[in-house]
Amino acid sequence: MTFIITTPPAVEPVTLDDARAQVRVASVQEDELLTRLIGAARQHVERTIRRALITQGWRLYLDDWPPGRVVRLPVTPVQAVTSVTVFDAEGMPVALDAADYDLDGISAPARLKVKAGAGASSRSLNGIEIELTAGYGDAGEDVPAPLRQAILLLVAHWFEHREAGIDAATASIPFGFDALVAGYRVPRL
C-alpha cells in the first residue's frame, strides 16, 4: 500500500500571530522561520497521530483488494472518498460507481468496504487507486484545541532550540506534547 498527498492543506491550523504570541516575538523579523516551523510542526503532529488536520487530498494505491474487500485507510478523519479506480486488461482506468463501496468514516482508522464483484484490476502492481479527502475541516478552528496547542508547543520549542548542538538531541520533543496528542493517535494498520 502506497499513499501520497495530492492536495496539501490550504491553510495551517495555527496562524502566524498565534505562533508569534507563543514565542513572545512581536516583530515580523522571524516570520519566515515561524512559518516554516508551523508547517513542520503540523506535519509532525499529523505523522505522530496518523490524522490529517486541515482538509487535504490523498491517493492510495493498492495491488489488490485486501481480504473481505475492506480497505483500512491510512489517514483519518475521512470526509469523502472522491473516486475508486481500477485498471482493465488494456491498462485503461475504470471508475467504480459510488454505489459499489461504502465508507466507514467513524472508525479510526477509517474503512472502505468494496462490494463483492465490483472492480477487479488487471494490473498486478498499483492496479487500484482510491482518492479521498481527509481532515477536520477547512479552517484552523476546525482542528481540536489540544492538537493546535501541540503545534504551538513544537513551534516554540524548535524556535528556542533552532541551533544544532549537544542539547538538541535531548530537546527534540517538548514536555507535554505526548499528553496533548495521546487521545488522537490512530493505531497502526
Question: Which residue ranges define each predicted feature?
Answer:
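Divalent metal-cofactor coordination and adjacent catalytic microenvironments
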Residues: 1-189
